[in-house]
A protein has these predicted regions:
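Gly/Pro/Ser/Thr-rich low-complexity, intrinsically disordered segments predominantly at protein N-termini
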Residues: 1-134
Length: 134
């Protein structure tokens, strides 16, 4: 059963649900992000070309699949002798164009550029080398 709560103070979506809002703007996306406060769910995606905002609230088992893929990438990177910086949760925004929240992302080649940062700003920071969305 889909249960969505959306008012001027709250944004929530029942686990396993997805909702798409057509005809939306970047300002609408930013407003929804602010309603979510510091929570990581529901995940929010915006695409200016489609003018859609997508809200997604994964099931608890979703995290297990993300953990497995993240661990697999780490094993491969260790075997290759590469250093990395992993970010999750993270909101990646290209101002006015797109906003997305991958399940996890890795900075490998661009690791040095973001070391010590708690937030990524794509207007000055490079994008992740690898983003995983399950």
């Amino acid at each position: 059963m889909l249960l969505i709560t959306l008012n001027e103070n709250t944004l929530s979506l029942s686990p396993g649900s997805q909702v798409i809002f057509p005809h939306q703007t970047w300002e609408d996306y930013e407003r929804l992000l602010s309603l979510r406060l510091q929570k990581t769910y529901p995940k929010l995606y915006f695409n200016r070309k489609t003018q859609e905002i997508r809200l997604m609230s994964p099931l608890p088992s979703h995290g297990n699949r993300v953990d497995t893929l993240r661990d697999l990438v780490k094993i491969i990177l260790r075997r290759q002798g590469k250093d990395w910086q992993c970010f999750d949760p993270i909101t990646l925004k290209m101002l006015g164009e797109a906003g997305l929240e991958p399940d996890t992302c890795f900075y490998i080649d661009n690791r040095q550029a973001i070391l010590g940062k708690e937030r990524i700003d794509l207007t000055v920071d490079p994008p992740p080398d690898l983003a995983i969305e399950v």
